[in-house]
Amino acid sequence: MKKISILIMPALMAGMAFTSCSDYLDVDKYFYDQMTLDSAFSKRQYVEGWMSNAFEPIDQLAESDGITRFLSDDIVKYDGHDLQNGNYSASTNNGRSEELLYKGYECIRKASTLINNVDRCPELTSSEKEDMKGQMRFVRAYAYWALLRHFGPVPLVPEEGMNVSLSYEELSLPRVPIDETVNFLDNDLKIAARSLPLRRTVNNMGHPTRGAALALRARLLLWAASPLMNGNKDLFNVKDKEGRQLVPQEYDEAKWAKAAAAAKEVMNLDMYSLYTIEPSPTTPDYERPPYNAEYSDKKFPDGWADVDPYLSYKSIFDGTIQGSKNPELIFTRTKTGGNQINYWVKESMPRTLSGNNSIGVSQKQVDAYLMDNGQTVAEAKQSGYYREDGFTTSASALNEGGAPFLPAGVSWQYAHREPRFYASIAYCGSIWKCTSASEKGYRNQQIFYYRDLNDGKQGFKEDCPLTGIGFKKFVNDEDAFTTGGYIIDKTEPTFRYAEILCIYAEALNELTSGKEYSIEGYNNEPVLVQRDAAEMRAAMKPIRMRAGVPDFSDMTYNDSELMRAAIKRERQVEFVGENSFRYYDLRRWKDALIEENQPFMGCNINISNDESRVQQFYRPTVVASMPKVFIQKMYLWPFTTTELKRNTNLTQNPGW
């Protein structure tokens, strides 16, 4: 029987725990029914089964299903106290983090084995084999990527596998320098892009394309260029057993150029565009962005005349448009991605409507949204456009006391916000439509989070949005968990085009003005990039026009510091709740030490709807049960003590 050089966990053994480091870097002779390696790659159906099995761990690697999604400064869940408080260590590490390591290397093993052995199958054509290899290179790179941004430097498994006759110590792999790993993955994704098709059929939507490989490459290279891993002397002590430094200590601007070039190659495919919906003839004027002489009369992407900003953004996430028809979608996990999105729906839905009522949005996140005229909240306070006190008295903006998108009884501080706010935030008093519910009493419910109400804090129990501000980005108007209701199928936006545009602008902004870089592309052709305000505008303006907010000023585009701050804010708003972006962004920017040490603020959920006190509910209040703690060592997660005992060549991250 021929030995398999890299472990492939069979479906029948998937639930078994590892007992040694060699369990996931070593050998297992089984595949499903204990086939030999020769048998496993002898027939098309076996190879296709193997490949399907190799995709499975990706479901556990996605950021929408991980411990990090509620651990930043934007969104909180009432049962996440320990991790928010920093109560984890190498000896008490959350099991989800250990599972990430387990699933990551399971993915790597399975993908590598197919790459090395698919040529044995006589029933596959050469093009089919190359496609499968390309898919597995994507899977392998995705797994490494998930490990890298969580733990930092990790062991790199030899492509050719490992000889099981080696001693236990010889099978224990050390961590590899970041640059070495990133260069390997960069090259691997270039190879994948050359062998993958531009499109997939609807039935194969969950299989990566050329664009998916290039998008992952852009995301990886942006991370490698960012301050956390580019000349970060705070991580000088991340070393292997031999004392070799694993995190680059010298800043290299060319890494930003590589990230920009990678994003540009996705754009140059001319395969993707931002999804937009035209305004309905019945859309009232007051639900359109305020008139702006520069944008209101121009068509997208120069303006928003032919765009409904609210529906254009909302429909990407709530299942209105199928993934296969969305020009913005680059890649999605089809197996469980939709299930994970509907998990968010269940957690977001109020208790009154049979949801778990558990997700709260921070005041910081609410304040990140602009006013509908493009002003920040701070600017609008000075101009008088923003009101903190009082409540709407009409459900129609045509009447005095009414405001666009708001029903009656809502705090004025939520009035006149940009459309993405209303598509994402369930402010106190928002309407949950739940139109599929069979009982009328469960449809079009206005939900308040005041104390002692059904969806607010009751007694000492805090099973409610801890900030008094809910989240509804992924909720479709038809979604209902009550009798007769149903949940609309949704597509997880694992990679979408708006991210690529933001990557391109962010990377260009970090380049020295006037300095041009020539970067070798995936097809070996040079890609030229330099800091260019017009190029950055071409990337960012469409996102702003789709959102119905004015573009950044010329001053912002021409000033790298202003542009950096603008891009950070744009990512915070555009990608809220997606792929744990905020959590990992704050870390790669090295902003977490400041941003995540600020008190987690929200409304005062101890205030009832008593008329004499209700205004106090909206005074920004520290969420006392969720104190935020962030110290330097938390930029990287620890390996568990158990894992360090298993792999004697594995070194711990500093401070743990």
Name each region found by the language model.
Residues 148-149, 155, 220-232, 510-514:
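Short coil/turn linking the two alpha-helices of tandem helical-hairpin repeats
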Residues 21-68, 412-415, 639, 643-656:
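Membrane-proximal, proline-rich intrinsically disordered regions
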Residues 21, 104-107, 184-186, 260, ...:
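Long, intrinsically disordered, low-complexity segments
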Residues 4, 15-41, 185, 218, ...:
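Bacterial Sec-dependent N-terminal signal peptides
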Residues 141, 217-218, 489-547:
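Extended amphipathic alpha-helical segments enriched in small hydrophobics
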Residues 39-60, 80-151, 168-210, 410, ...:
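Conserved, well-structured interaction surfaces
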Residues 327, 339-496:
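Flexible, polar/acidic helix-loop-strand segments at domain edges
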